[in-house]
Amino acid sequence: MALTSIFGGSSSSSGTPATSSPSDVKTQLKSQISQELAIANATELVNKVTENCFEKCLNAPYAASQDNCVDQCLAKYMRSWNAISKAYINRIQQASVNGEI
């Protein structure tokens, strides 16, 4: 993505000035940052789950009984992830209401 599109400009070189207000630009930037953080967090979760659960549960030679260990490990990670995410979102919302961000 070109920086000009982030700041309200077009990627073409038509030379027309950007018509976005500063608040629109700020909103667009916040939205883009939020999306990028969500992707980074999801990627980190997948990497940690893969690293920890598969290392803990899967041994050579593979046995079908190891599936249960992986399932339980994944479920535990997802429960923890959801609890942490809810707490984080609540803190961000509270900070926003208080004008801290």
Swiss-Prot record:
Motif, Twin CX3C motif: chain positions:
53-73
Source domain of life: Eukaryota
Q: Residue ranges of region Disordered?
A: 1-27
An annotated GO cellular component of this protein is: mitochondrial inner membrane
Cysteine pairs forming cystine bridges in this chain are C53-C73, C57-C69
The record ties this protein, via InterPro entries, to: Tim10-like, Tim10-like_dom_sf
Report the record's Gene Ontology biological process terms.
protein transport
In terms of Gene3D superfamilies, this protein maps to:
Mitochondrial import inner membrane translocase subunit tim13 like domains
Keyword line = Chaperone, Disulfide bond, Membrane, Metal-binding, Mitochondrion, Mitochondrion inner membrane, Protein transport, Translocation, Transport, Zinc
Q: Name one Pfam family in it.
A: zf-Tim10_DDP
* Molecular function in Gene Ontology: metal ion binding
Q: Where is the composition biased (Low complexity)?
A: 1-23
The main place the protein resides is mitochondrion
The protein's topology relative to the membrane is: Peripheral membrane protein
Subcellular location(s) per record: Mitochondrion inner membrane
- Family, per the entry? Belongs to the small Tim family.
Entry domain remark: The twin CX3C motif contains 4 conserved Cys residues that form 2 disulfide bonds in the mitochondrial intermembrane space. However, during the transit of TIM13 from cytoplasm into mitochondrion, the Cys residues probably coordinate zinc, thereby preventing folding and allowing its transfer across mitochondrial outer membrane.
How does it associate, per the subunit comment?
A: Heterohexamer; composed of 3 copies of TIM8 and 3 copies of TIM13, named soluble 70 kDa complex. Associates with the TIM22 complex, whose core is composed of TIM22 and TIM54. Interacts with the transmembrane regions of multi-pass transmembrane proteins in transit.
- Role according to the record: Mitochondrial intermembrane chaperone that participates in the import and insertion of some multi-pass transmembrane proteins into the mitochondrial inner membrane. Also required for the transfer of beta-barrel precursors from the TOM complex to the sorting and assembly machinery (SAM complex) of the outer membrane. Acts as a chaperone-like protein that protects the hydrophobic precursors from aggregation and guide them through the mitochondrial intermembrane space.
- Name listed for the protein in its UniProt record: Mitochondrial import inner membrane translocase subunit TIM13
Which organism is this protein's natural source?
A: Kluyveromyces lactis (strain ATCC 8585 / CBS 2359 / DSM 70799 / NBRC 1267 / NRRL Y-1140 / WM37) (Yeast)
Name of encoding gene: TIM13
